[in-house]
Protein backbone atom coordinates (compact mmCIF):
# COMPACT_ATOMS: atom_id res chain seq x y z
CA UNK A 1 0.00 0.00 0.00
CA UNK A 2 2.88 2.37 0.83
CA UNK A 3 4.38 1.75 -2.62
CA UNK A 4 1.00 2.46 -4.20
CA UNK A 5 0.65 5.77 -2.34
CA UNK A 6 4.18 6.74 -3.36
CA UNK A 7 3.45 5.92 -7.01
CA UNK A 8 0.30 8.03 -6.90
CA UNK A 9 2.25 10.89 -5.33
CA UNK A 10 4.98 10.74 -7.96
CA UNK A 11 2.44 10.71 -10.79
CA UNK A 12 0.61 13.69 -9.27
CA UNK A 13 3.87 15.63 -8.92
CA UNK A 14 4.74 14.82 -12.54
CA UNK A 15 1.42 16.27 -13.72
CA UNK A 16 1.91 19.48 -11.73
CA UNK A 17 5.35 19.95 -13.27
CA UNK A 18 4.09 19.14 -16.76
CA UNK A 19 1.44 21.83 -16.34
CA UNK A 20 4.05 24.39 -15.27
CA UNK A 21 6.30 23.45 -18.19
CA UNK A 22 3.49 24.24 -20.63
CA UNK A 23 4.40 27.90 -20.19
CA UNK A 24 7.23 29.17 -22.38
CA UNK A 25 8.20 32.13 -24.56
CA UNK A 26 5.74 31.03 -27.24
CA UNK A 27 2.95 30.55 -24.69
CA UNK A 28 3.44 33.07 -21.84
CA UNK A 29 -0.30 33.06 -21.04
CA UNK A 30 -2.87 30.34 -21.48
CA UNK A 31 -6.42 29.39 -20.55
CA UNK A 32 -7.05 26.32 -18.42
CA UNK A 33 -8.47 24.41 -21.39
CA UNK A 34 -5.33 25.10 -23.44
CA UNK A 35 -3.04 24.04 -20.59
CA UNK A 36 -5.03 20.86 -19.97
CA UNK A 37 -4.81 19.94 -23.65
CA UNK A 38 -1.06 20.69 -23.85
CA UNK A 39 -0.31 18.64 -20.72
CA UNK A 40 -2.66 15.82 -21.66
CA UNK A 41 -4.72 16.23 -18.48
CA UNK A 42 -8.46 16.15 -17.76
CA UNK A 43 -9.84 19.64 -17.19
CA UNK A 44 -10.68 18.88 -13.56
CA UNK A 45 -7.08 17.79 -12.89
CA UNK A 46 -5.71 20.91 -14.57
CA UNK A 47 -7.84 23.14 -12.32
CA UNK A 48 -6.69 21.23 -9.24
CA UNK A 49 -3.00 21.41 -10.13
CA UNK A 50 -3.22 25.09 -11.09
CA UNK A 51 -4.73 25.79 -7.68
CA UNK A 52 -1.64 24.25 -6.08
CA UNK A 53 0.70 26.29 -8.31
CA UNK A 54 -1.23 29.46 -7.39
CA UNK A 55 -0.99 28.59 -3.72
CA UNK A 56 2.80 28.32 -4.05
CA UNK A 57 3.00 31.64 -5.91
CA UNK A 58 4.27 30.14 -9.16
CA UNK A 59 1.32 31.10 -11.40
CA UNK A 60 -1.37 33.77 -11.28
CA UNK A 61 -4.54 34.64 -13.18
CA UNK A 62 -4.29 37.68 -15.42
CA UNK A 63 -7.89 38.80 -14.91
CA UNK A 64 -9.06 37.55 -18.29
CA UNK A 65 -9.37 33.89 -17.41
CA UNK A 66 -5.81 33.14 -18.49
CA UNK A 67 -2.83 32.10 -16.40
CA UNK A 68 0.79 33.22 -16.44
CA UNK A 69 3.94 32.48 -14.47
CA UNK A 70 4.94 34.87 -11.69
CA UNK A 71 8.33 36.55 -11.16
CA UNK A 72 9.05 33.84 -8.60
CA UNK A 73 9.58 31.40 -11.48
CA UNK A 74 12.03 33.80 -13.14
CA UNK A 75 14.02 33.91 -9.90
CA UNK A 76 14.15 30.11 -9.90
CA UNK A 77 15.34 30.13 -13.52
CA UNK A 78 18.13 32.60 -12.72
CA UNK A 79 19.18 30.49 -9.74
CA UNK A 80 19.24 27.37 -11.89
CA UNK A 81 21.38 29.06 -14.56
CA UNK A 82 23.78 30.44 -11.96
CA UNK A 83 24.20 27.04 -10.33
CA UNK A 84 24.46 24.98 -13.51
CA UNK A 85 27.99 24.12 -14.63
CA UNK A 86 26.43 22.64 -17.76
CA UNK A 87 24.87 25.94 -18.87
CA UNK A 88 28.02 27.88 -17.94
CA UNK A 89 30.21 25.51 -19.94
CA UNK A 90 27.78 25.51 -22.88
CA UNK A 91 27.47 29.27 -23.35
CA UNK A 92 30.85 29.93 -25.07
CA UNK A 93 30.44 26.85 -27.26
CA UNK A 94 26.92 27.89 -28.30
CA UNK A 95 28.21 31.40 -29.06
CA UNK A 96 31.00 30.05 -31.27
CA UNK A 97 28.64 27.70 -33.09
CA UNK A 98 26.09 30.45 -33.77
CA UNK A 99 28.81 32.84 -34.92
CA UNK A 100 30.59 30.38 -37.18
CA UNK A 101 27.58 28.61 -38.71
CA UNK A 102 24.93 31.35 -38.80
CA UNK A 103 22.48 28.93 -37.18
CA UNK A 104 20.62 29.19 -33.88
CA UNK A 105 22.49 27.14 -31.26
CA UNK A 106 20.57 25.68 -28.31
CA UNK A 107 21.25 23.38 -25.37
CA UNK A 108 18.32 21.12 -24.41
CA UNK A 109 17.81 19.20 -21.17
CA UNK A 110 15.17 16.64 -20.32
CA UNK A 111 12.65 17.28 -17.55
CA UNK A 112 9.97 14.64 -17.16
CA UNK A 113 8.24 14.12 -20.49
CA UNK A 114 9.52 17.32 -22.12
CA UNK A 115 12.80 18.77 -23.33
CA UNK A 116 13.54 22.33 -22.21
CA UNK A 117 15.85 24.82 -23.93
CA UNK A 118 18.26 25.59 -21.09
CA UNK A 119 20.43 28.02 -23.07
CA UNK A 120 20.34 29.52 -26.56
CA UNK A 121 22.43 31.82 -28.73
CA UNK A 122 21.07 33.36 -31.91
CA UNK A 123 23.30 34.31 -34.86
CA UNK A 124 23.85 37.95 -35.77
CA UNK A 125 22.06 37.59 -39.08
CA UNK A 126 18.30 36.83 -39.07
CA UNK A 127 17.67 33.12 -38.58
CA UNK A 128 13.85 33.12 -38.52
CA UNK A 129 13.94 31.51 -35.09
CA UNK A 130 14.03 33.49 -31.85
CA UNK A 131 12.82 33.31 -28.28
CA UNK A 132 13.83 29.67 -27.97
CA UNK A 133 15.39 29.79 -24.51
CA UNK A 134 13.02 28.45 -21.85
CA UNK A 135 10.65 26.81 -24.32
CA UNK A 136 9.62 23.21 -23.73
CA UNK A 137 8.80 20.56 -26.32
CA UNK A 138 7.38 17.02 -26.18
CA UNK A 139 10.03 14.31 -26.37
CA UNK A 140 8.69 12.72 -29.56
CA UNK A 141 8.93 15.81 -31.79
CA UNK A 142 12.03 17.60 -33.02
CA UNK A 143 15.66 16.53 -33.29
CA UNK A 144 16.90 17.52 -29.80
CA UNK A 145 13.88 15.98 -28.09
CA UNK A 146 13.98 12.69 -29.97
CA UNK A 147 17.70 12.39 -29.32
CA UNK A 148 17.08 12.71 -25.57
CA UNK A 149 14.21 10.22 -25.77
CA UNK A 150 16.42 7.76 -27.65
CA UNK A 151 19.06 8.00 -24.92
CA UNK A 152 16.72 6.90 -22.11
CA UNK A 153 16.82 3.35 -20.73
CA UNK A 154 14.43 1.07 -22.62
CA UNK A 155 11.88 0.76 -19.80
CA UNK A 156 11.82 4.52 -19.18
CA UNK A 157 11.56 5.23 -22.90
CA UNK A 158 8.63 2.83 -23.23
CA UNK A 159 6.85 4.46 -20.29
CA UNK A 160 7.26 7.90 -21.89
CA UNK A 161 5.82 6.64 -25.18
CA UNK A 162 2.93 5.05 -23.29
CA UNK A 163 2.10 8.39 -21.63
CA UNK A 164 2.34 10.20 -24.98
CA UNK A 165 -0.15 7.72 -26.45
CA UNK A 166 -2.56 8.16 -23.55
CA UNK A 167 -2.49 11.92 -24.09
CA UNK A 168 -2.88 11.55 -27.86
CA UNK A 169 -4.41 8.22 -28.97
CA UNK A 170 -3.48 8.99 -32.60
CA UNK A 171 0.14 8.35 -31.60
CA UNK A 172 -0.55 4.63 -31.13
CA UNK A 173 -0.52 4.04 -34.87
CA UNK A 174 2.95 5.61 -35.04
CA UNK A 175 4.55 3.56 -32.24
CA UNK A 176 6.58 1.22 -34.45
CA UNK A 177 7.70 4.09 -36.65
CA UNK A 178 8.80 6.09 -33.59
CA UNK A 179 10.71 3.16 -32.12
CA UNK A 180 12.48 2.47 -35.44
CA UNK A 181 13.51 6.12 -35.66
CA UNK A 182 14.88 6.04 -32.10
CA UNK A 183 16.94 2.96 -32.97
CA UNK A 184 18.40 4.84 -35.96
CA UNK A 185 19.22 7.86 -33.80
CA UNK A 186 21.08 5.72 -31.27
CA UNK A 187 22.99 3.93 -34.05
CA UNK A 188 24.22 7.01 -35.89
CA UNK A 189 24.70 9.23 -32.82
CA UNK A 190 22.68 12.26 -33.90
CA UNK A 191 19.13 13.27 -34.83
CA UNK A 192 17.63 15.45 -37.55
CA UNK A 193 14.25 17.05 -38.15
CA UNK A 194 12.79 19.14 -40.96
CA UNK A 195 9.94 21.48 -40.03
CA UNK A 196 8.76 19.09 -37.33
CA UNK A 197 8.38 21.74 -34.60
CA UNK A 198 9.09 25.05 -36.34
CA UNK A 199 7.84 25.15 -39.96
CA UNK A 200 10.58 25.81 -42.49
CA UNK A 201 13.42 25.04 -40.07
CA UNK A 202 15.90 22.20 -40.50
CA UNK A 203 17.70 21.03 -37.37
CA UNK A 204 20.34 18.61 -36.17
CA UNK A 205 21.14 17.55 -32.60
CA UNK A 206 23.99 15.63 -30.97
CA UNK A 207 24.38 14.21 -27.45
CA UNK A 208 26.29 15.80 -24.57
CA UNK A 209 27.45 13.07 -22.22
CA UNK A 210 28.85 12.82 -18.72
CA UNK A 211 30.07 9.54 -17.24
CA UNK A 212 28.79 7.74 -20.36
CA UNK A 213 25.27 9.06 -19.85
CA UNK A 214 23.50 11.54 -22.14
CA UNK A 215 22.62 14.59 -20.04
CA UNK A 216 21.70 17.09 -22.76
CA UNK A 217 21.47 17.60 -26.50
CA UNK A 218 23.14 20.34 -28.50
CA UNK A 219 21.03 21.61 -31.39
CA UNK A 220 21.63 23.76 -34.46
CA UNK A 221 18.69 25.05 -36.51
CA UNK A 222 18.55 27.09 -39.71
CA UNK A 223 16.01 27.85 -42.46
CA UNK A 224 15.76 24.78 -44.70
CA UNK A 225 15.59 26.89 -47.86
CA UNK A 226 19.15 28.13 -47.24
CA UNK A 227 20.64 24.66 -46.94
CA UNK A 228 22.00 22.47 -49.72
CA UNK A 229 23.47 19.01 -49.06
CA UNK A 230 26.97 20.35 -48.37
CA UNK A 231 25.66 22.93 -45.90
CA UNK A 232 23.66 20.30 -44.01
CA UNK A 233 26.73 18.08 -43.80
CA UNK A 234 28.73 21.00 -42.39
CA UNK A 235 26.05 21.68 -39.77
CA UNK A 236 25.99 18.01 -38.75
CA UNK A 237 29.75 18.05 -38.28
CA UNK A 238 29.68 21.34 -36.36
CA UNK A 239 26.91 20.10 -34.07
CA UNK A 240 28.71 16.87 -33.23
CA UNK A 241 32.01 18.68 -32.71
CA UNK A 242 30.33 21.21 -30.42
CA UNK A 243 28.64 18.48 -28.38
CA UNK A 244 31.95 16.63 -28.04
CA UNK A 245 33.68 19.84 -26.95
CA UNK A 246 31.04 20.40 -24.27
CA UNK A 247 31.41 16.79 -23.13
CA UNK A 248 35.19 17.29 -22.78
CA UNK A 249 34.67 20.58 -20.96
CA UNK A 250 32.43 18.93 -18.37
CA UNK A 251 35.10 16.28 -17.78
CA UNK A 252 37.72 18.91 -16.90
CA UNK A 253 38.40 19.56 -13.20
CA UNK A 254 36.79 22.85 -12.10
CA UNK A 255 39.07 25.89 -12.19
CA UNK A 256 37.91 28.44 -9.56
CA UNK A 257 37.33 31.88 -10.99
CA UNK A 258 37.78 30.78 -14.60
CA UNK A 259 35.27 29.38 -17.06
CA UNK A 260 36.12 26.01 -18.57
CA UNK A 261 36.64 25.98 -22.31
CA UNK A 262 37.15 23.10 -24.70
CA UNK A 263 37.83 23.96 -28.32
CA UNK A 264 36.05 22.02 -31.01
Language model segments and positions:
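Short, structured helix-loop boundary elements
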Residues: 9-13, 70, 83, 87, ...
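N-terminal helix-turn-helix
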Residues: 1-83, 87, 244-252
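Signal-transducing coiled-coil/dimerization helices and immediately adjacent hinge/linker segments
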Residues: 255-264
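Amphipathic alpha-helical effector-binding/dimerization core
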Residues: 65-163
Amino acid sequence: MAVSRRAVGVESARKVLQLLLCFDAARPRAAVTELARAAGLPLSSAYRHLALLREQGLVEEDGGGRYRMTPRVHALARAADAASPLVAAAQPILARLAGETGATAVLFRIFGDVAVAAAAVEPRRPAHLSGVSGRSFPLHKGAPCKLLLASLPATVRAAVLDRIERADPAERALRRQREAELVLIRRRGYAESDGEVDPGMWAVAAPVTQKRRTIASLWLAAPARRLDAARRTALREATRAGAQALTRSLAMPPDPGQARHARY
